């Protein structure tokens, strides 16, 4: 049996509505796996089946019956389902958002007592078997938790849920045990490949949920005796040197940027899970963190003068397949409420493109793209731009940043226009409008990045110039 299988290495951000300037809830994540592994974007329509459906994983044969009614939802699957679906993130017709997963590790003590289940649920299946069947973030926690309790899980993971009012972070810590914490409305959390939830209040069901029998499991195996101070991270998580160079520095940088901290240690194992920002946050604050690489610190790998530039693993790196910010906006009609901001390829070298999940279709470029380069694929357009910039970052970084700024201005203006018109529409007319405008937004991004590619090719330094 595989004791621990790791499929991705991501960074996540969760933000409560009162911490955002516009009262949105936010869940966001970089999906990191391979340096060239395309993603697509799709919308699964609402469907009612006559018979109960059965899901069978192509990855590990995890099998589960599904309800007859499947709600509409968006998703970002792999270009191939040979190794599983990996739908990763989306928003459903009830305005519920889900992102899965933030890969993590459990310690040998807990896995010895409750091993991972080889054919249990894993990252590749979670969005597919949870998001289309829930009407709130809290329901998402409950459904995923019940699946893990019944079928087990083959991995240690963190999962993000949100709706108009609540943001939840879910963590599985062993084969059948899990906890989840609601992010306070005025707070945020940054997570980076470690079990992150700290003190669990077992008597506060409004803000904590957990698996049946977890108290007995922990007590009977002598993992914890003080349940008034039950620390999930300490009991179930790891505390290794690799955590201190791979994981905690990313949390440190996120908190440094969002809270203005200057006195925390990037290698500390005691960084708090829940934090308050030093200002009301905006979407571009979240985008900045997800695209960051320790800027303005001694650890920035893009600054050749930094002796410690490669000491820590950065948040944005070449293995990022896509990055998403799932924004659920307060007080909006449900079909307009959510925006799935999607950046294909490496976050630092891409742009977040808005997509309204009530749309019926996506741009053709988001439906294609395989293992080899394809200039008709959105993934490969953004990936190529990043590769060209990387080759001569010092010379080309300004051209890239100018493009990113132009795209951000165009698309933010576009969202204002779309919202204003969308609020006057309903039914199929609304969905058709959101489809047309979402595709138009995607086209703007593709046009600007193809222009960038042409510019980079034209101005690339020649061997004679670099002698």
Show the residue positions of the predicted features.
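Secondary-structure boundary elements
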Residues: 133-142, 146-155, 279, 296, ...
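Second-shell loop/turn segments in exported
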Residues: 115-116, 126-133
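Substrate-recognition/cap regions that form aromatic- and gly/pro-loop-enriched pockets
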Residues: 305-422
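Short Pro/Gly-enriched beta-strand edge/turn motifs at strand-loop
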Residues: 68-72, 141, 302-310
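A contiguous strand-loop segment
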Residues: 3-123, 143-268
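Glycine-rich, aromatic-lined ligand/substrate-binding cores of catalytic
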Residues: 225, 230-323, 327, 331
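Single conserved hydrophobic/aromatic residue that forms the stacking wall/gate
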Residues: 458-467
């Amino acid at each position: 049996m595989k004791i621990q299988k790791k499929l991705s290495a991501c960074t996540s951000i969760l933000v409560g509505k009162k911490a955002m300037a516009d009262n949105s809830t936010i869940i966001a994540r970089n999906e990191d796996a391979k340096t060239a592994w395309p993603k697509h974007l799709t919308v699964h329509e609402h469907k009612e089946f006559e018979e109960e459906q059965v899901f069978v994983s192509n990855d590990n044969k995890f099998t589960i019956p599904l309800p007859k009614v499947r709600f509409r939802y968006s998703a970002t699957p792999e270009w191939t389902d040979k190794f599983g679906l990996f739908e990763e993130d989306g928003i459903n017709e009830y305005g519920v958002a889900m992102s899965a997963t933030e890969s993590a590790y459990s310690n040998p003590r807990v896995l010895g007592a409750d091993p991972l289940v080889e054919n249990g649920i894993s990252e590749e299946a979670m969005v597919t078997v949870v998001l289309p069947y829930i009407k709130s973030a809290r329901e998402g926690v409950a459904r995923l938790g019940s699946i893990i309790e019944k079928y087990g899980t083959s991995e240690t993971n963190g999962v993000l849920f949100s709706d108009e009012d609540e943001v939840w972070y879910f963590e599985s810590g062993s084969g059948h045990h899990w906890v989840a914490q609601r992010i306070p409305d005025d707070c945020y959390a940054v997570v980076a490949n470690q079990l992150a939830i700290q003190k669990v209040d077992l008597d506060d069901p409004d803000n904590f949920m957990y698996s049946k029998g977890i108290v007995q499991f922990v007590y009977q195996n002598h993992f914890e005796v003080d349940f008034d101070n039950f620390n999930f991270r300490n009991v179930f998580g790891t505390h290794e040197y690799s955590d201190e160079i791979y994981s905690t520095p990313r949390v440190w940088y996120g908190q440094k940027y969002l809270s203005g901290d200057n006195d925390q240690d990037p290698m500390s194992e005691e960084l708090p899970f829940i934090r308050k920002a030093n200002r009301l946050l905006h979407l571009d604050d979240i985008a900045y963190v997800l695209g960051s690489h320790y800027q303005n610190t001694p650890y920035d790998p893009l600054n050749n003068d930094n002796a410690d530039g490669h000491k820590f693993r950065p948040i944005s790196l070449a293995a990022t397949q896509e990055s998403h910010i799932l924004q659920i906006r307060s007080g909006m009609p449900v079909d307009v409420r959510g925006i799935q901001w999607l950046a294909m390829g490496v976050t630092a070298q891409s742009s977040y493109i808005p997509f309204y999940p009530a749309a019926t279709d996506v741009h053709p470029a988001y439906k294609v793209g395989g293992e080899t380069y394809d200039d008709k694929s959105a993934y490969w357009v953004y990936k190529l731009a990043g590769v060209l910039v990387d080759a001569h970052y010092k010379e080309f970084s300004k051209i890239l940043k100018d493009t990113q700024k132009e795209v951000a201005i165009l698309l933010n203006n576009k969202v204002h226009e779309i919202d204003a018109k969308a609020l006057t529409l309903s039914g199929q007319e609304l969905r058709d409008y959101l489809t047309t405008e979402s595709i138009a937004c995607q086209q703007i991004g593709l046009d600007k990045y193809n222009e960038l590619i042409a510019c980079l090719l034209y101005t690339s330094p020649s061997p004679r110039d670099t002698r």
